[in-house]
Amino acid sequence: PGLAQADSHPVLCVSWNDARAYAQWLSKRTGKRYRLPTESEWEYAARAGSVTARYWGDDPVQACRFANVADQSRFQTWGFGQKHECTDGHYFTAPAGGYSPNRFGLYDMLGNVWEWTEDCWNASYAGAPAVATAWLSGDCAQRVSRGGSWSTVPRYARSAARNKNPADHRDNLTGFRLARTFE
């Protein structure tokens, strides 16, 4: 991916197609149903019952306690760009689970890597389907990722931030987490 990674770091450089293929492989291998979360499931999990911009509150200065984002470490390394006014010690990805979890006990819901969701891209989330249902209409050549990454500037390090990329796009900012369906 062009940056140092260890087994404890999140997976990078996987497309939406790759992430779905992995979920299908894991489902077949384990006999359990794994999949990408829907956009609404992802946001529900990220917010963890909060109504603030970020699951830790509205203050972006607190980001370095909860997320690996564009901060002083990144700015000091590259010398340019917007940044959070804190230092998390990582200028690229950080080991998974290295920051405080949200109220649901989930780690890294903001920052570190953008996470693919099942949904097709729609410019606005207004009119989206019911919770736990993927939005399968709109621009399905583009897929939604959520959560921001290690290069996310303060205004995008929030639970409602959305991004889009082609389903076959790979970069060192994007990875995934899986959801499991219980039957």
What is the meaning of each model-derived region?
Residues 172-183:
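Short, structured beta-strand segments at or near domain termini in extracellular proteins/domains
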